[in-house]
Amino acid sequence: MWPPCGTLRTLALARSRGARACSGDGGVSYTQGQSPEPRTREYFYYVDHQGQLFLDDSKMKNFITCFKDPQFLVTFFSRLRPNRSGRYEAAFPFLSPCGRERNFLRCEDRPVVFTHLLTADHGPPRLSYCGGGEALAVPFEPARLLPLAANGRLYHPAPERAGGVGLVRSALAFELSACFEYGPGAPALPSHVRWQGRRLALTMDLAPLLLAARSP
């Protein structure tokens, strides 16, 4: 069983304002903590482009109102998977199950947002995501960074169960952009990245996966 579930349930019900249509999701309505069947509860969340997690119906979404408990964040995002529940699949494309609870997630861009580059004296660097520190991290693959001209954002491989592609938070993307090299004629996108003394060609192999994820 998921230890933070009880606390989370209390918070969700306390903050809920009753049935509420989510903007931009086709007019779907829900109530936080609703029970569509016996002993089952449903909650609804939103992750922004900074990797901050909120109750979806929170009117104010900022650092003060986002979830910060590391244990909860690790459990929530480590269980994240595509929503194949038959409920709210279009509006909330990801689901983090917790026993008899269904925790639905929609996102501003991607469900995984990389927030920190973790380096150590021994071992390769890792990218941490969504406030989970070392417990939510993947190996850093600089050659597979994907800069997208359409929105000016940077992407990196993410766990397959969470869509395979994650967004790099803007502050971290700015730091990493200093490592990019551009070809002759100052093209819009970089062609190489310099990392730890090596010059690596950007593979751009994430582009088809990202475009497929964005297709209706």
From Swiss-Prot:
Coiled coil: none annotated. It comes from the Eukaryota. Pfam families: DUF4505 (PF14956). One of its GO terms (cellular component) is mitochondrion. InterPro entries: DUF4505 (IPR028108). Belongs to the UPF0598 family. This is UPF0598 protein C8orf82. It comes from Homo sapiens (Human).
